[in-house]
Each structure stands twice: as structure tokens, then as C-alpha cells.
Amino acid sequence: MIGYVLKKILGTKNDREIKKIRKWVEKINALEESLDKLSNKDIVLKAQDLYFRVNQNEHIKQAIIEGEMVEELIEAFALVREASKRTMGLRQFDVQLIGGIVLYQGKIAEMKTGEGKTLVAAAPAFFTALTDTGVHVVTVNDYLAKRDATWIGPIYRFLGLDVGVINSDNMSYIIDWQDPEKAMEAIEKDIRVWPKGMVGDAIDYSKIDVHAKTSYFTKAISVERAKAYEAHITYGTNNEFGFDYLRDNLAVSKDQIVQVKGHGYAIVDEIDSILIDEARTPLIIAGPSNLDNKVVLQANEFVQTLEIEKDFIVDEKNRTAMLTEEGIEKAEKYFNIQNLYDIRHIDLVHAINKALLAHNLYKKDVHYMVKDGEILIVDEFTGRALPGRRWSEGLHQAIEAKEGVEIQEENQTLATTAFQNYFKLYKKLAGMTGTAETEALEFKEIYSLDVVVIPTNKPNIRKDLPDAIFKTKKEKWEYIAKVIEENHAKGRPILVGTVSIEDSETLSKLLEQRGIKHNVLNAKQHEKEAWIIAQAGRKGAVTIATNMAGRGTDILLGGNPEFLAREILKQKGIDEDKATEEEWKQAYEEATKITQKEKEEVIKAGGLLVIGTERHESRRVDNQLRGRAGRQGDPGESRFILSLEDDLLRIFGGDRVKKLMEFMKIPEGEPIESSIVSKSLEGAQERVELQNFQSRKRLLEYDEVINIQRSVVYDIRRSILFQDDIKEEIKDFIKDVIHTQVFTLLTEDEPELWELEPLKTFFKEWIDLDLPEKFEAKDREELEEEIFKLVMEKYAQKEQEIGEKTMREIEKVFTLNIIDNLWREQLHTIDKLREGIYLRSYAQRDPLVEFKKEAFRLFEELMLNFKISAIQSIMNAQISKEELEQQEQNMFNLEIDTLNKSMAISEALENIAKEFQEKRPRFRTLKDRLEERKKKLEKKGESA
């Protein structure tokens, strides 16, 4: 009661947070009028001045990196809003500025669909980018990364910042003006999209100069990967940022490093999708392993002879499948072996387990699709295909065998990290989503991120109708088709969310039978995605979409006038880039009339109707689908139409609902609409969410062990990679190896009790070093020093033998190669350890504790083996006479080339010097000296 009263008086924690931020927004608004009076050039100069001020004050710079509230934020955010108005004709609402400040502080901004999240990221990204640290804006797919960077690009370019984009397949871009001359002229002539003098919320869209936008259009220009990362702000997907990090830590030269600015600040769009939904799937870079594909094919044939429940059991809740005792006996008979679980048959057991999963838990057009003889993973949260991604540990091969396509080699992990640990690399992490509050605890516990719910710009008036549940899928689909037909006849736009490609195609056929025109948006059609979504709010539009989460495009009632204007120009045969101001104006006016008229008709019909055809495991994904209706205060409706055969109901409590329907004598074809059923469904979702949270938490606990090791290994790699001379590190390695061997092999303190033979054997086998029969040392520390001198003498001999420069190169190449090979083996061993560690629980031991102990022991061995192997390889390096001669020849050629270039430069200088006769003798002398030096070298080369 007291808490309730206090909340009423003081407001919630979220209310208090918003109240504090509003004071900063008022200060930003106070600058709008004065900035509006400035010319474009003055705004550009103000941005440059702010950049220099930030970089000249280390205290302010550090405060910005950490997300502290500083006075410079007011000017930065005001400049971004002004640039947005002038180049794009968009003015950030106060709630968008609030969202931007929340992101700047390193928190999660929960903003409803249609509140303009893409634009919200611009101000915090710009302000933090002034510090010249790596600012990454993370999206869920390549299309959105490139689209968002190009769309927001005019703001950044206008204010003097570079923007990069990274896509998959190693495609990278820099965003620049589509027509640099036109853009510079527009800045010079003070051309604005948003008219001068129009300040504040009162917006007269008829005064927006649409044609002026064309002056500020941007385009993506292909560049090398590192160039995209050198930009002040880089857009890309979570997968590509993560993979580039792993690839950087497999690089064998500094030139191969692409994430040149490191990890300063990340703004993650759809943060719940990336950090929660995808957290169970680690990022893996893999190479070929030794598993024989014949075993995969044999396992695939074998599992098709088995009977479910009798020979194997499937646990859909935990997504596992395993052989029963009868199944094991069948396997031993089928493969003619005595003991299936003998160590010799480990690959066969592995292949059978994966084949069971492939046939019983992974469904075509739900979890994967077959395209051009290849298995493509379908992201269950977005419905998109993920080309280039493969399931690890033999699962992908098992599905290839199941579908009868070519089986590609199984991959061995070369580098891996979990998204949780990758994003923890950033000094400041923030994110946006329409639905984060339900996962606030997980964000706080795992990422130390607070969630702030941002108020909507206009009140939400969407109606969420109760669920309708049918006995069978057939009844459900018939009813959905009927609801669509009725609402389509009224001219109402309808969006239907399905969970699989198969479902979207089932509904599509039903609508075709009824003669209803519609668009299908799924993993097979995402190239047309933007166009389909842009039209989804038009009168009578019917859109079927697999999982709307993360689509990233607003559905405007009546349609998007800008998209329609482009269509109109296209229909008239006019290239939009070459269209005149008058042509653009006419097309836009025509499009605006059409969309405005349709919007009024759609609003009368009740706004957008959203139909969910199946409940998702996560309530968030359901809420994201609902959120497509009712944007920016528009009317709208949402409803889930389900069946007892849907996965969630079938696995979690469908029997109870079925009994209830039978008890209530619900006739066939009639739905049940009951609060008891809705609560039962929500309870099932909560249980799955909790189960998935525990799974992600457990994954993180295990990956944290590997993460500590990974950090050490990657730090060593970078230290080696970024130094030209690692001789001092090599000396330290030698000292460490000597210390370990002396203290391991000589257990007694007194020299007379030392048994030196094992020590002598080790050094002989290690680097072919013969230790003396006796040492003068009085203790083990002195003995270490004596042995170190002997090893360094041998080391000096090797350096003299192959040359100092070659020795330095060999040290780097060998150490990098060895640590990579050992780390690869470590990951393989850790994978196997993790697979079997659960067995320790049968001995009343905590598997995680046991895993930590074993992993630590393995890592200690790795570090010692690394040092031993590195020194051994360097000391045993053999450079042939031919290689040495080739090196000398290369050096000779290099020097001749350098001299030729020097002579060319001297000739250029001589030409310039003709105008300055008094300097001519000096250049002549230089040229003569260079020619003389070249002749001597050539003579030396001939005699050699």
C-alpha cells in the first residue's frame, strides 16, 4: 500500500528518468530558432568547431565515450535535428530526442513501432563519433544496414562525418553524396528541404521542398572492408561485426585487420532479437574436419528404419532426441558392431544423434529451406534465409543427407564467440526495440543494461481482440481466410503473420481460390520486402508475412507517398535520379493525393488489421506483430487465430484446452474464446521464456570460461602481430619454459639431491641442447639463470646463422601459426568436454564447476605447449643456401628499385630547378652520386 502511494506521488523509476531527460530536451529545443537562422555553411562550421572542441578536451572526450551528460550534448543533438530538417525534411519529435539521450547514456530505449527508431539513432551516433572511437550501428540484416546508412547518410555527410557499411560476402561500402557537386552547391546556396522559419512541432507538409531532397541523396560506394570501419560511423549486422572480430583474430598480418578503431560504442537495433533470441547460437568460423561423409549417409539410412517411442524418444520441449535400449541394440545389429558406445564408434554415435534431430525436430520450410541444391537456415525469429550460415557439429550434414542434396564437409571450429561476450567488448552498449520491458531482468543480469520505456508521440488506440482457438489447423485456416475476405471487401488493409514459409503458402493458396489479390513476404521473397511493406497499408492490401520481427519498415495507412511517387515516375518512363524539380513535384503531389484519400478510407474501415496465425514461444515476438497496427495514433486491430495442433499448444497444455472444448461442446468450425485459455497460453509462453532464459544463461556461464581464455590468446596474438620485433617476448617464453621444467623435474631444494637426467633429456629433445654434467648453482633460481645463458647462446648462434631480419620474421610467423593451431585444438577439446560434462552430475558433481576445472587445466597445458613449441620451431628453423641467396637477391633488387625511384625524383627536382639556376649544381651532384652508387651495386651483383 505504501509503495503504491509513493509511486502515485513520485512516479515510477521510468517516469523519473523521463522527467530528468525532458529538461535536456527543453535545452535542445531552445537552440532550434537560433540554428534555423544560420546558413547551411554556418551549420557545417559549427559541427566542425564542436568536433575540435571535443577532441581538444580529454575529460569531455572520455565523458562522451562513457555516456555521461555533458553540455556539448545539447549542441550536438540540436545540430543533428537541424541537419535532418535541411537534408531530409524530417524533424525529430521530443520523444525521439528522449530516445536518443537514453541510447547515448548506454541504455535500452523501448520505442513502439512507427516511432522512428532509425532516426533516433542518428544523434547519439553522431555525438559519440566526434570522439573518433569505433561507433557501430547494428541491424538484423544486410538490407537494413545498407538502407539505414543510405537513408540517414545525408545527416552525417552534411555534418562532416563519414559513414561505412559492412555486408555479408565481404561487401563493404562508404556512403557519399549521389552527386557531390549538386550537394556542395545546395550547401553553398542554402537549399533546404524543410523551409526556413518553420520551427517547432507545427508542421505544414505542403511547404516541404521534396525536390530539394534530391540534392542530398546519398549512394553506397564499394570499398575495402577496413575503409568501411575507418569511417566515423559503421552500419552492419550483428553477424558481420562478430565474424570480422573473429577474422581479425585469425589475421597473420597487420594489414588484414579491419576493425581498426576497435569497439567504442554500439547501438543495436532490435536489441532483443539480437541479444536474446539469437544468443543461443554462437558465432563460429570453421574449417574442414576429418568426419567421413559415408558415416553421415549410413546414419541417415539407419534412422529411417526406426520407430518413434520404441527405438528412440523425442523431447520437443528441450529439442532433443535419443535412442532407447531397443534402438541401441538395433544399431549394433545394423552396423554389425558389439558396443555402439565403444570409443572407436564415437563418430557413428555422433552422426546417429544428429540424424535423429534432423528427421524429427528440424522441419523443411520452417527451420530451413532447400534452394539450388543447398540447405539454407531460416531464422525462426525473422523468417529470413541466412545464406552462408551452417549449423555446426554435423547437424547441417545430417539435414543435407535427409534432403538428398550434396553433403558438404563438416566443419571444425577455428574461432568462436557468443553474442553476449562479443557485445561486452564495447565500452558503451545501447539498443532499441519495440518490446524490451518483458526481458528487462535478463538485460540487467547479463548485460548490465537498463530499459527505459519511451512515451509514444501520440496515444495508442489499437484494439487487441481475444484469441480465437479451433480444434484443427484446417478449421483455423478456413476461418482466417473468411476473416480476410470479409475485411478485404471493406477495403481494409490486412497483415497476416505466419511462423513458417509452409504456412504462408498454405494461406496464399486459400486466398487464390477466393480470388483475393495478396502479397507474400517470406524468406524466399525478401528482395521485394521494402516495396511489399510500403504498400501494405494501402486500401484493400493483403500481406502475408513470415514473422514480422525486425522487418524494419513502417506500414503507413494509405501507403507511402515517396515510394508511390517513384512508382509514378517509373510508369512515365522517367529516371528518378534525372527527374526535374517539376517532374518530382508533380509525381509527389499525385502520390500524396492518392495516399491521403486512401488513408481516410482505411481509417473509416478501422485501420490496419493484424492477424497472428500461431503464438510464438516468446510473447515479445507476438507483441512485435501486434505493434504493426496503431502506429502514431492510427486506429488498428490485432487478433490471434489459433488451433490445438499449433506447436506451442500441442507441446504445452493443448490437451487441457481440448478437454475444455469437449466439455463446453464447441461445435466443429467454431472457435473458443476464453480468458482461461488465454491465460493457459500465456503461462505456456512464460514457461518457455524462462526455459530459454536459463538455457541462454547457462550458455553464457560456459562461454564465459572460454571467453577468459579467448581474451588471453587474442591479446597474445595482437601483441605479436603489432610488433616488428618480439625478441623480448621470446626471451620471456624461454625463461617460463626453463622455470617450469626446473621446478617440475627437480623436486629437491639441495643441489646434491638433484636428479639431472630428466632435465638433460628434455633440453636435448627440445632444442638439441647438451646440458653440462654439473652446475655451479646453489639453488634452483641460480640453475635457471645458468640454463638461460646456455639457451641464449644457442639462440644467438641461430640468429647469426640465418640473419637478424629473417630471425625476427620467423619468430612472428612461427608463434602466430603455433598459437592458432593450439587454440583450434583447444576449442575442439572444449567442445567435446562440454558435450560429455553433464555425466559428472551422476556422481553428484556440479557439471559447470567440473567444466571450469578441466578447462583451466587444459588452458595451462596450452600456454606451456605454446611456449615450448614456439621456441622449438624457431631453434630448429632451417634456411637453405638457395633461400638465403634469394633473400640477398630480393634485397639487391629492392635497393636498385629504390635508387631508380630516387633518380627519377632527382630528375623531377632538376626540371623544377631550371627556374632556379642558382640551385642547379646541388641537384647535379645528387644525381651523379646516385648514378655512381647504382653502377657499384650492379657490378657487385654481376660478380656475385
Swiss-Prot record:
UniProt membrane topology term: Peripheral membrane protein
Pfam family of the protein (one): SecA_PP_bind
EC nos: 7.4.2.8
Domain of life per record: Bacteria
SUPFAM superfamilies: Helical scaffold and wing domains of SecA, P-loop containing nucleoside triphosphate hydrolases, Pre-protein crosslinking domain of SecA
Principal cellular location given in the protein's record: membrane
Cell inner membrane among keywords: yes
BP-aspect Gene Ontology terms: intracellular protein transmembrane transport; protein import; protein targeting; protein transport by the Sec complex
Gene Ontology molecular function: ATP binding; protein-exporting ATPase activity
Keyword ATP-binding attributed: yes
EC primary class: translocase
Gene Ontology annotations for the cellular component aspect, listed alphabetically: cell envelope Sec protein transport complex; cytosol; plasma membrane
Entry keyword set: ATP-binding, Cell inner membrane, Cell membrane, Cytoplasm, Membrane, Nucleotide-binding, Protein transport, Translocase, Translocation, Transport
Cellular location(s): Cell inner membrane; Cytoplasm
Residue stretches spanning the membrane: none
Ligand binding (ATP): Q96, G114, E115, G116, K117, T118, D554
Quaternary structure (record): Monomer and homodimer. Part of the essential Sec protein translocation apparatus which comprises SecA, SecYEG and auxiliary proteins SecDF. Other proteins may also be involved.
Family label: Belongs to the SecA family.
Name of this chain's protein: Protein translocase subunit SecA
Protein source organism: Hydrogenobaculum sp. (strain Y04AAS1)
